[in-house]
Amino acid sequence: MTEQLELFDVTIIGGGPAGMYTAFYSGMRDLKTKVLEYNESLGGKILLYPEKVIWDVGGLPPTRGEQLIQQLEKQAKTFEPEIALNQKITSFERDEHQNILLTAENGDRHLTKTLILAMGHGIPVQRKLEIEHADRYEVTNLYYTVQELKTFAGKRVVISGGGDSAVDWANALVPIAESVTVVHRRDMFGGHEKNVANMKASCARILTPHELTDLHGQGDKIDAVTIQHLETGEIERIETDAVIVNHGMKGDLSVLSEWGLKQGEWGLIEVNEKMETNLPGVYAVGDLCTHKSKVRLIAGTFVDGVNALNSAKLYIEPEAEKVAYVSSHNERFKEKNKELQTVGAR
């Protein structure tokens, strides 16, 4: 059966920033590439935060998440990799030639010489409020992500959470909302130090260590929340027009252990400096992996992807160059440069 399937040099599971940049670099190394993505579109976790401003990608000014996805997707498609969406991979096996055969939940099958895992923390699912009947407010003014900041202009906003996104949303909403109240279970926030400092210096009301314990409303719309101090038990009712919840995400990575991959803390895949896992021809990049020099920034995932791809290239072609030539030596880029110069001359 496997001989009927098209064989790819590299298959990347995951279409977030790590997966997209790895697909681009795979084209630079002249490898036949396929990207498998669980969602209906590329973007990964950033899809949940399209309005979030990203500051830490080298060479880019502060960029909205949605814009970064668009730019990465355009770059990823430079060498025309095959992209398959709605692919939840459930089965991993080897054929008689030691190629890797992947099967998706919908029955699609994919054959590849090497595999790069760029699945982040697994299929991302927001952690929702564990408050009875909270789901009925999701159609009105209970939010688990911020699609457009203008939705909250002039409103009294309560934000529950203390991670990067909660802090970023607070900073973004303070200038346009009537009021912003941040409720967090801990005294310490998990966001970047500078962003946390900016939030604390703003007019946002910050309540720690507090927990959101109840939602109040008429019909399907919240008009107030109850919060509780976790040490004293003191309760306060706060009137609000919108509630934003960011309690992090959970992802299912159990399938990886079923495949025999060595996992460390939090289920992350252990790799060496070449991004090699304990399985031949299988590599892991981005948030999914852990290694001694790991940098947990988007820029760090790009480096992971480059190193994994170089290892995959040598796995397939042991006599190949260890790294790609600089982009100015790539024939495809020379063609693209001519197109850009032609457009610029008009």
From Swiss-Prot:
Keywords: FAD, Flavoprotein, NADP, Oxidoreductase
Domain of life: Bacteria
The enzyme's E.C. designation: 1.18.1.2
InterPro entries, per the entry: FAD/NAD-bd_sf (IPR036188), FAD/NAD-binding_dom (IPR023753), Fd--NADP_Rdtase_type_2 (IPR022890), Ferredoxin-NADP_redctase_2 (IPR050097)
Gene Ontology molecular functions: ferredoxin-NADP+ reductase activity; flavin adenine dinucleotide binding; NADP binding
Cofactor section: FAD
Annotated family: Belongs to the ferredoxin--NADP reductase type 2 family.
HAMAP family, per the entry: FENR2 (MF_01685)
Protein name as catalogued: Ferredoxin--NADP reductase 1
Organism: Bacillus pumilus (strain SAFR-032)
